[in-house]
Amino acid sequence: HAKVSTGTVYSYFKDKKEIYMGAYEAYLDSISTQLFERLDKVQPFCLEYFVNHWISAYLELYSGAGHALVQLRMMIMDDAEISQHFSGLENKYFLKIGEILGRNGNTQNNRSEKVYISCVLVDSLRQEKSAFTHNGLDFEALKQQVAKTVVRLLSE
């Protein structure tokens, strides 16, 4: 481990909140970059395959981030600046999914809203898999239902 003085850290960040924001942003950016590299390679484009690939890649990349994401959500609820900052990062994620869809012929009305709903559904699978598992739910059946719902939503 490299030793870094507190003074060095605070020369880049004004306080602990900025350190947390910078660390979370770097962490989420690295995961998102990997996700989009995978999704950009889906060719030839087929919506059903894209959605299944999106779900699998998202679960693989984000499932280990459950604890960090819970901590970040708690910070977002307590601090308007953090909330606004990470809302902007989420918007980039939604826009990138919409961009991939648009580039591949998906030009439906209300695409942004449909992408947002789809992202929430995909993330609910991550939560179920890694953080808030419910007894009595068949995860594979749930995953199939989410995939079918997202494909249908993005096809309308």
Annotated model-derived regions:
Residues 26-36, 49-56, 60-64, 80-105, ...:
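Amphipathic alpha-helical packing segments from all-alpha helical-bundle domains
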Residues 154-156:
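Generic C-terminal helix-cap and adjacent flexible tail
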Residues 1-18, 22:
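Helix-turn-helix
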Residues 30-41, 121-129:
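Solvent-exposed, amphipathic alpha-helical segments
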